[in-house]
């Protein structure tokens, strides 16, 4: 469903942000 897709994109987005902040990519 669209909602689950948005949730998954949100998780990926947060992961990328945390990666950039922590610089542990």
Curated annotation (Swiss-Prot):
Q: Name one GO cellular component term.
A: extracellular region
Q: Which residues form the signal peptide?
A: none
Q: Which Pfam families did the record assign?
A: Antimicrobial_2 (PF08023)
Domain of life of the source? Eukaryota
| BP terms from Gene Ontology | defense response to fungus; defense response to Gram-negative bacterium; killing of cells of another organism
Q: List the disulfide bonds.
A: 19-25
Cite the entry's keywords alphabetically: Amphibian defense peptide, Antibiotic, Antimicrobial, Disulfide bond, Fungicide, Secreted
Role according to the record: Antibacterial activity against Gram-positive bacterium S.aureus (MIC=55 uM) and Gram-negative bacterium E.coli (MIC=1.5 uM). Has activity against C.albicans (MIC=58 uM).
Query: Which family is annotated?
Result: Belongs to the frog skin active peptide (FSAP) family. Ranatuerin subfamily.
Its recorded name reads Ranatuerin-1C
């Amino acid at each position: 469903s669209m909602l689950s897709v948005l949730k998954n994109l949100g998780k990926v987005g947060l992961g990328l942000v945390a990666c950039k902040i922590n610089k542990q990519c």
